[in-house]
From Swiss-Prot:
Active-site positions on this chain: 99, 124
Catalytic activity, EC: 3.4.21.92
Key words, A-Z: Cytoplasm, Hydrolase, Protease, Serine protease
Function: Cleaves peptides in various proteins in a process that requires ATP hydrolysis. Has a chymotrypsin-like activity. Plays a major role in the degradation of misfolded proteins.
SS bond partners: none
Organism of derivation: Halalkalibacterium halodurans (strain ATCC BAA-125 / DSM 18197 / FERM 7344 / JCM 9153 / C-125)
Record-given protein name: ATP-dependent Clp protease proteolytic subunit 2
Keyword flag DNA damage: no
Gene Ontology biological process terms, A to Z: protein quality control for misfolded or incompletely synthesized proteins
CDD domains found in the cross-reference section: S14_ClpP_2 (cd07017)
Length: 194
């Protein structure tokens, strides 16, 4: 969300109010993930989800995603919050949902996960690097394998694909069109309008 942020001006009666576009979207219960997932982005998304739940726990939330993915720990903070809050969460891929962003796309409420027609979705196994003594490398490798297993389990449970198929598909970058993501079970529908 770095760079230029547009502002909108709303008029009511004799007064005007200026909002940055993200704050204005939040008024309509729309959250936009449009960057790589790091701790700062995750904390912002989590805060917005918690705010919207506190404001009205019975009203749906809309999470629009256009992201290359990012940190698994930051991603799981968003994922767990999505499962924790009471409102149904519609997920909508606009552009790309890659890596952990694809996990967030499939984390939406079943029946309410969408992709726009030209969206691209990509799943893969986690990656990481380490240096140091052999014992340090073993600890890091064990952690990454554990994260991989969690990602396989979540993807399998939420798509209906077997864990074996998901593990095989995640072995390398596995790109899907919107139609392929629909067949895979990552999204429930391809949409062209609201």
């Amino acid at each position: 969300m770095n760079g230029y942020v547009p502002y909108v001006i709303e008029q009511s009666g004799l007064s005007e109010r200026s909002y940055d576009i993200y704050s204005r979207l939040l008024k309509d219960r729309i959250v936009f993930l449009g960057a790589a997932i790091d701790d700062q982005i995750a904390n912002s998304i989590v805060a917005q989800l918690l705010f919207l739940e506190a404001e009205n726990p019975k009203k749906d939330i809309y999470l629009y995603i256009n992201s290359p993915g990012g940190s698994t720990s930051a991603g799981f903070a968003i994922y767990d919050t999505m499962q924790f809050v009471k409102p149904s969460i519609h997920t909508i891929c606009t552009g790309m949902a890659a890596s952990f962003a694809a996990i967030l796309l499939l984390a939406g409420t079943k029946g309410k996960r969408f992709a726009l027609p030209n969206s691209e979705i990509m799943i893969h196994q986690p990656s990481g690097g380490a240096q140091g003594q052999a014992s340090d490398l073993a600890i890091t490798a064990k952690r990454i394998l554990g994260i991989r297993e969690k990602l396989v389990t979540v993807t399998s449970e939420r798509t209906g694909q077997s864990p074996e198929k998901v593990a095989k598909d995640m072995d390398r970058d596995y790109f899907m069109s919107a139609e392929e993501a629909l067949e895979y079970g990552i999204v429930d529908q391809i949409i062209t309008s609201v």
